[in-house]
A protein has these predicted regions:
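Positively charged, small/polar-rich N-terminal and surface patches that mediate targeting and assembly
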Residues: 1-112
Length: 112
């Protein structure tokens, strides 16, 4: 089985996050995206410290689909430099991990 990844990204607001999530799931780039509003981010950008409300997206995908997910997310994201970070899932419920892999197949298998 392909390596499963958990991809972390922030968006400026819940509506933008939901739009990104829906597109990525509809295009089979992510099997599932959790949208978690209410995040506060503090970061340094262009020489200043900023504090902003953001919404977190937690995406589940495969290593094989990650390059396409990253490219699509980068194209759709409103930030100049979006936070897109992926970590490998070292363990999980095998049936769930299989489901993630099946939902992100470029060409879905026939349910024959």
């Amino acid at each position: 089985m392909d390596t499963i990844l958990l991809v972390y990204c922030t968006a400026p607001d819940p509506d933008t996050a939901r739009e990104l999530a829906r597109t990525l799931v509809e295009e089979r780039l992510a099997a599932c995206v959790n949208v978690l509003p209410g995040l506060r981010s503090l970061y340094r950008w262009q020489g200043r410290v900023h504090e902003d409300a953001e919404t977190l997206l937690l995406m589940k995908t495969t290593a094989a689909r990650y390059p396409a997910l990253q490219e699509r997310l980068r194209a759709l994201h409103p930030y100049e430099l979006p936070e897109i970070v992926a970590v490998s899932v070292s363990a999980g419920l095998p049936a769930y991990l299989d489901w993630v892999a099946a939902q992100t197949l470029d060409e879905p298998e026939d349910p024959a």
